A protein has these predicted regions:
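N-terminal signal-anchor/first transmembrane alpha helix
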Residues: 1-30, 99, 103, 261
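Transmembrane-helix boundary motif in ABC transporter permease subunits
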Residues: 1-4, 74-106, 122, 180-181, ...
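Interhelical loop and adjacent transmembrane-helix boundary motif
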Residues: 2-8, 53-60, 218, 226-273
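Transmembrane alpha-helices
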Residues: 15-24, 103, 107, 159, ...
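Short membrane-interfacial helix/loop motifs at transmembrane-helix boundaries
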Residues: 24-61, 123, 127-128, 230, ...
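Non-cytoplasmic
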Residues: 26-33, 38-39, 115-117, 165-168, ...
Length: 285
């Protein structure tokens, strides 16, 4: 028992040390840097200021933040519209077939997402496979310009993040009480009524979880907008990357990072509150 207790203490200490060293301290440094002043020679000057946060209210950066939220919201809705039917179909398949499709859903995670975006870029380019196929069918006379548009960024985000929507939806749909659906049918409820009044409320935890898993990273995937959207379709992640790597304005980059983290934290808080309300509603019913 003593050896087991010592081993547990070592494991816990290792995990805590890892979190402190690679999560807590770096975030603390970013928070501290966000209140300092930029210096052209040493990157950071130890002079306290709030200008880095006030600059975020500048129309240039504020518009990028709103644009990021808008693009993330559209990508989330698209993932939900595409992911819900797929998750429903997956949950209704025979038990023997599901593992294969789940495996195919997870396989893309084995490949770096940046490589997959490069592949999608080639596929959607003016001389790519999609345009060549449409020209061969006679649907179009000249290649359609898809790349470097907001639509291309949305396609890229959906392509990368769709599995994150499907998995929690599949988990919620799989747990649906079939006798409850049969009872609704016996009582004369139509398929639409059953879907709206029973299925959606019961799968709402999966919907909320999937939306968060898609929307939170969607605002920061700077390489998707870089490769698919170009300079005119920036996300807030592009601003952060540019401030740290190109402009070398670390204080403002830190302030932008903290702001994005706070926005994500508020979304998580909304999810937590919504989950509690849903659980209370289910308990009352």
């Amino acid at each position: 028992m003593k050896n087991t207790s010592k081993f547990q203490n070592v494991v816990i200490a290792t995990i805590v040390g890892w979190l402190v060293l690679f999560v807590f301290l770096p975030n603390l440094m970013i928070i501290a840097t966000s209140f300092l002043t930029r210096d052209d020679t040493d990157f950071v000057k130890l002079v306290f200021t709030l200008d880095n946060y006030s600059r975020l209210l500048d129309p240039l950066y504020f518009d990028v933040l709103l644009h990021s939220l808008n693009m993330a919201l559209i990508a989330t809705i698209a993932c939900l519209v595409l992911g819900y039917p797929f998750a429903w179909f997956l949950a209704r398949l025979p038990q023997k077939v599901r593992p294969l499709l789940l495996f195919l859903l997870i396989v893309p995670f084995w490949t770096n997402s940046l490589i997959r975006i490069y592949g999608l870029k080639i596929f959607l380019s003016t001389k790519g496979y999609l345009n060549e196929f449409l020209l061969w069918l006679g649907v179009i006379d000249t290649p359609v310009r898809i790349m470097f548009t907001p639509g291309a960024v949305i396609v890229g985000l959906v392509y990368i993040l769709l599995p994150f929507m499907v998995m929690p939806l599949y988990s919620s749909i799989e747990k649906l009480d079939k006798p409850l659906l049969e009872a609704a049918r016996d009582l004369g409820a139509s398929k639409l009524q059953t879907f709206i009044r029973i299925i959606i409320p019961l799968t709402m935890p999966g919907i909320i979880a999937g939306c968060l898993l898609v929307m939170l990273p969607a605002m920061g995937l700077f390489y998707v907008s870089d490769l698919m959207g170009g300079a005119k379709n920036l996300l807030i992640g592009n601003v952060i990357k540019s401030q740290f790597l190109n402009i070398r304005d670390w204080p403002f980059g830190s302030a932008t990072s903290i702001t994005l983290t706070v926005v994500m934290g508020l979304m998580l808080l909304i999810y937590w509150r919504a989950s509690r309300l849903l659980n209370k509603k289910v308990e009352l019913e």
